[in-house]
Amino acid sequence: MAIDFKQDILAPVAQDFAAMDQFINEGISSKVALVMSVSKHVVEAGGKRMRPIMCLLAAYACGETNLKHAQKLAAIIEMLHTATLVHDDVVDESGLRRGRPTANATWNNQTAVLVGDFLIARAFDLLVDLDNMILLKDFSTGTCEIAEGEVLQLQAQHQPDTTEDIYLQIIHGKTSRLFELATEGAAILAGKPEYREPLRRFAGHFGNAFQIIDDILDYTSDADTLGKNIGDDLMEGKPTLPLIAAMQNTQGEQRDLIRRSIATGGTSQLEQVIAIVQNSGALDYCHKRATEETERALQALEILPESTYRQALVNLTRLALDRIQ
C-alpha cells in the first residue's frame, strides 16, 4: 500500500507544524526590509520540510510534552536548513531551486550570503530561548561540521580520484548532519538521553540514503521533477556516487570520459556520461547502497517504543526510498 505523505507522515504533527511556521515567520522578521524580502523568498521556496517534521515526530516519539519547545526546535532546524541552501546556491552558482529562481539569481551573491548569515544567527537566537546548554553545544558543533562538509565537497570538485569513503564524509557533513541535529536535538529536549544515540544513527543513515537517492535522480529524473537542471552535479564537477561507481565498473575510453567530465565540468558530454552511468551497473550499486542505509535507519528506530510517531518516521524513511523504486 502506497504511503501518503500528508496522512501517514504529517498528520500526527500537523498542528505543531502550523505553529512551527509561526515561529519561522517571527524568526525572519527584521528591521531591514531587504532582509525580510529575501528571507521570505527562500523560506517560501521550501519543499516538504522533512527535517522539521522529523524533529517533531522524534520529539513525540521520545515522549516530549512541551509542544512549544518542540515547535521552536523544528523552526530552528528549518531556518538552518534554509540558510545552508542559500549559501549552497551561491557556491554552486545555481539559478534554480525547486523550480524557483534562487536568492542569488533574484538579487545577487552578496545579498544571498548575508541573508544566509542572518538566518543562521537568528536560528541560534531562538535556540538560546530553549535554555539548554547541551542542545546549544550539540547545534554549535553540528553547524561547524555542516560547514566542514561543504568545504570537503568544494575540495572534491573536479577531482576524479575521489573515493566512496570521501563521498560519504561529504554527504554526512552536508546532508546527514542536519538530520541528526533534528532528531538527536529532539531527544535532548525531551530529556531522554537514552534515545540520543539511536535517533542520531537513524537520522545519519536516513540522510545518507536520502543524498544517495538525490544523486541517483540527477541521472535518471527530469528538470520538472527535480526542480533543478539535470546534470547539475556533472556540470559543477562533483564526483557523486553514480560517477564513482561508474568509474569502478568501466575501463578504457568510457572511464576516461567520466574522468575528463569530472575534471573539466560542463555538460557538453552529458548524454554520453548518463548512458555510461545507466549501462555500467552504477545505478544498481547506488540503489543497493541507498537500500542498505535505509535498512540501518529502520533498525535504529526499533529501540524507540512503539507509537504513531515512530511509525510515521518509518513511513518517512520508506517514502524517501520509494523515489527511486
Curated annotation (Swiss-Prot):
Binding site for Mg(2+) 1: D88, D92
Keyword set, alphabetical order: Magnesium, Metal-binding, Transferase, Ubiquinone biosynthesis
EC class name: transferase
Pfam families named in the record: polyprenyl_synt
Cofactor dependence: Mg(2+)
Keyword Transferase: yes
Cofactor, how bound (note): Binds 2 Mg(2+) ions per subunit.
Catalytic activity, as annotated: 7 isopentenyl diphosphate + (2E)-geranyl diphosphate = all-trans-nonaprenyl diphosphate + 7 diphosphate
Assembly and oligomerization: Homodimer.
Protein name in UniProt: All-trans-nonaprenyl-diphosphate synthase (geranyl-diphosphate specific)
Species assigned in the record: Rhodobacter capsulatus (Rhodopseudomonas capsulata)
